[in-house]
Amino acid sequence: MKKAIIITSRVHPGEIPASFALEGMVDFLLSDAKEAKVLREQYIFYIVPMINIDGVVHGNQRTNLAGLDLNRVWSNPSYLLSPVVYAIKNLASMICKERKIDVFCDIHAHF
């Protein structure tokens, strides 16, 4: 059975280069490269390209619209104040019921 890899990005809205880094990763994973083919044979990839969409749209640098740094609420996310983190944790729990998660990668990048 294939294992899982979860990749997330843009938990901090101001980390624009993280989107480009993730785009490069996805381009590679979809390529004909031998290594990419091996990874696709061994893993299922779950990719969340932009965790903090509202923060990005509103020009925030680090927080969501509730003023929360989403990187600090993973242990106990609020359904109302940090719904995306809440949903990603639920997704990870559902994945764990079916397969092993080998990697959870949260991409950060600055200029």
Language-model features: locations:
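Active-site/substrate-binding loop(s) of hydrolase catalytic cores
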Residues: 1-111
